[in-house]
Amino acid sequence: MNARTFPHPPQPLTDGTAPILAGFECGRLHWNGHDLLHSTAHLPHAAMPHHYAVAREQGVAGARDGLSWRHDIGARVNAVPQGFPVIWDLVHFDAPPRPVQHAVACCQALGPDAWAIAVNEPSVGRRVSGMTPGRATDMALRMMATAACLPVRPRFATCDPFHHLHPSVFKATDRLVASGHVDMVGVNYYPHHAAEPLHRILRAVADRYRLPVMIAETGWHDGLRAAHRRFPHVRDRWDWLAHVQAEIALSGVPVAGLCWYPWLDMPAWDDPAHGRWPCGWPGRQA
């Protein structure tokens, strides 16, 4: 099984920046049934092996991916190159009808020393995920508690948006960390939503939780006016990557990884048949 992922504790780079991870979109949108694994062909029998081969060629340190209850869990795990580090989302905008059973199935497929995220972005709410923040957080807690009872369980990270420092932004992560099942805190930070500099976000998160920190999602959408308005010095995706790495170094926080999300230019959520959003990795994708 290709279960081995990041060392514990995760290791940042010695120059104050973070190693790059490839983030593969793996959700299913509740309002229109758009399965992003299908629309990007990120499937074991399709382009998934090629996607990983190209990501490795680009020098990434690992990836984020997903184990949807609608897909063959074992086939997805085994499609990853042997020994390549992956953090697996167990739920990504598509709640399984039986979350506990899904958690057990994922843990059995992953084996020892794996990393997982129980529920992606529990704070985003019903409009995006189909779940209220409370329900999504409760689901994550049940899944992690179930995993803790198994003889073999993954280490868990969190993954939630942190674009400002209002107390409300910490609510879901506070509950998850308080459970005692979390080994790393993930910060999602996008330029079109950012209201606080990233270095302040990272320092606040590191000081609050005293756990390893990673940037679980960040990226740049070419031509998105809100992003250009907030960061007029950023011209393109390479500039955004440099900006994020500079903010990591400025924070002084040893960030375990920087996940570029999504790695592939993304089919439009509401109209996947017509073009792709220019937001994937600025180097060769796949």
What are these regions (language model features)?
Residues N2-G16, L21, G83-R229, H243-A286:
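Active-site region of glycoside hydrolase catalytic domains
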Residues F24-H30:
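Short polar catalytic/cofactor-binding loops
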Residues C26, L67-W69, Y189, W220:
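Short beta-strand segments enriched in hydrophobic/aromatic residues
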Residues H30-H42:
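Acidic/histidine-rich helix-loop elements
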Residues H42-S68, P85, G180, M184-V185:
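Catalytic domains of carbohydrate-active enzymes, especially glycoside hydrolases
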Residues A75-G83:
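Catalytic-core regions built around general acid/base machinery
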Residues H233-W240:
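Short secondary-structure subsegments characteristic of cysteine-rich extracellular domains
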